[in-house]
Amino acid sequence: MGSQCLILLLSLTLAQAAEKDRPKFTPGPISSFPAQQTNGKVTVAARVFVKEADLRAAFGKLNPNDHGILPVLVMVANLSGQTLALGDLRVEVITPDRRRLEATPAADLRYLSGPPRPNMTPGPIPGRTPRLSRRKDPLAAWEIEGRAFSARMLPAQESASGFFYFQARYRGGSRLYLTGLREAATGQELFYFELPLEDQ
């Protein structure tokens, strides 16, 4: 029993150390977002991430745009007296030519490029088995899922933020369309939110 406790304690310590090594990312106050809309006492704000400095602050060396993924940071501020249910949240980008693009779940991004092909490099000694190269998909980086929007409930007077990911390039004149916010107690859906996505 004592060895199991020691192993558990060691794994928790290592997890905390790994978390400390990860760079911090703060979305900033909702007032700093370039696009905002308030319905009742709920405000939704959005910021598209295409600038190198913004991407580096959020994703480190990984630039999702290089892999055809557009990250959009969304913040929801609930200043109402009701808890909001976010489980049915639906987020889309509407392009200037009116195409609707649904957000891709963060957990699915690592599979977009398909399984990596083994690199059958011949071994250094003839007759030996070739070495397999184990190339990791760049979109499997912890920042993708770790910084995704994950809130399912939002208590009164609180806010939640995170990224939604779209398989698209940024196009000026695009808009973010968000539906599915409900009052948890009544199930009543809030009015939709539609925000411009301008690169600012």
Predicted regions, residues:
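Bacterial N-terminal signal peptides that target proteins for export
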Residues: 1-6
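Hydrophobic h-region of N-terminal signal peptides that target proteins for export
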Residues: 8-17
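Conserved functional micro-motifs across diverse proteins
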Residues: 16-200
